[in-house]
Amino acid sequence: MSAAAARWRARPHTAAEGVHYLVARSEDVLGALPVAAPDRAAAAGLPPWRAAEYTAARTLLRALLRETGEDLRGGPVAARPGGRPYLPDRPDLGVSLSHSSGWVAAAVGTGREVGIDVQTPSPVAARLLRLCCSPEDAETLTALPEADRRREFAWIFTVQEACVKALGTGLSGRPWTVPVPLGRSSGTWHQLHWTAPRAHQPVPTGCAWTERGVFRQAGGGGGGGG
């Protein structure tokens, strides 16, 4: 282990029994942890910026697996046709990846499907507020100062994205239809549970997971990867 890796201090957050996630800056991940050979090879043909977020997300996932006692070692992190990541060597584990403007996130669920999303706040059009939020919440958000409106909307949309990732549907799952009340830090939607960990994340993050027994080993569909 390198000296930088030995100084790695990120510790997983536990959303539920068997569901863990990590969020970190890409530069911190790549500065502290080695990139696995399969990930480096897979990123070889990508533009530099895309290769950085690709390898950072997968490196963070491998670190998360080690920290939770599920060390993947050099095993592959593959992607289904829709982009959803999975572990060919560990079909019992659901995984999810996300990246946004220098941040990466990874989640793992034992015997569950999981979805993770991270979003740096950005300008929000009035139409998007009306699409993703209840009329009351859209009105409240519109009245907020710009910076607050961007951040609060990002907390909502990360949960919506995480939910459709956990289902494996991606955008075809119409994330804007997932009801996420303004300011709420946890909730349920159909067979999913979700959390928006406002108290301990510096950037808006959403994590969603299924109940045990809902996991679909061969589940395809989209869901985005890093």
State the predicted function of each range:
Residues 1-226:
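Core catalytic alpha/beta fold that binds nucleotide/phospho-ligands
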